[in-house]
């Protein structure tokens, strides 16, 4: 192999590696963006499939483990009451960092509910997702959510990537 051929192969490998990272980030961004429409439409099975089979969802003192518990949350009477009254689980843009077959994402979200002729923000929160690449694509291994109430736990999630910015 000539030196030119070796350099071209290295350059192609670099481009393919960068393309894979971009494709992975896009897949994760799409997964995050799909949560709101799925949960607001009451699509329990599709919502549950966003998680790994052994995935966890911890939000405001509620701990769900596995797809069955996520599905049960979407099918619950409390959730049904939210969505039949008119709701929007809006997920803001996510910061996504990928490391091989695992990734970390942080974003803010709003839960907006219809109140007569108006809409009101019921909840503002921050979420940190640990994701895992599986045979059929990216899934949530753990999702942790905290209310943006000024508390230390929410600020800690918000600051997930702050160390990088300081370096």
Q: Model regions: which residues?
A:
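A beta-strand edge to alpha-helix "cap/lid" segment located at domain peripheries
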Residues: 2-16, 80-167
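Short, low-complexity N-terminal intrinsically disordered segments enriched in polar/charged residues
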Residues: 2-37, 41, 45, 49
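A solvent-exposed, acidic/Ser-Thr-rich amphipathic alpha-helical stretch
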Residues: 44-110
């Amino acid at each position: 192999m000539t030196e030119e051929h070796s350099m071209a192969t290295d350059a192609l490998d670099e481009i393919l590696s960068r393309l894979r990272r971009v494709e992975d980030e896009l897949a994760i961004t799409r997964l995050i963006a799909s949560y709101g429409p799925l949960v607001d439409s009451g699509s329990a099975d599709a919502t549950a499939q966003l998680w790994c089979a052994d995935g966890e969802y911890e939000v405001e003192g509620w701990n769900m483990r596995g797809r069955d518990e996520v599905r049960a949350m979407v099918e619950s009477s409390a959730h049904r009451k939210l969505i039949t009254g008119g709701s929007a689980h809006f997920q803001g843009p996510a910061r996504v960092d990928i490391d091989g077959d695992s990734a970390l994402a942080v974003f803010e979200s709003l839960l907006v509910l219809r109140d007569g002729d108006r809409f009101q923000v019921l909840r503002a929160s921050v979420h940190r997702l640990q994701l895992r690449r599986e045979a059929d694509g990216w899934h949530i291994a753990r999702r942790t959510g905290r209310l943006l109430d000024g508390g230390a736990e929410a600020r800690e999630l918000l600051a997930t990537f702050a160390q990088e910015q300081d370096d």
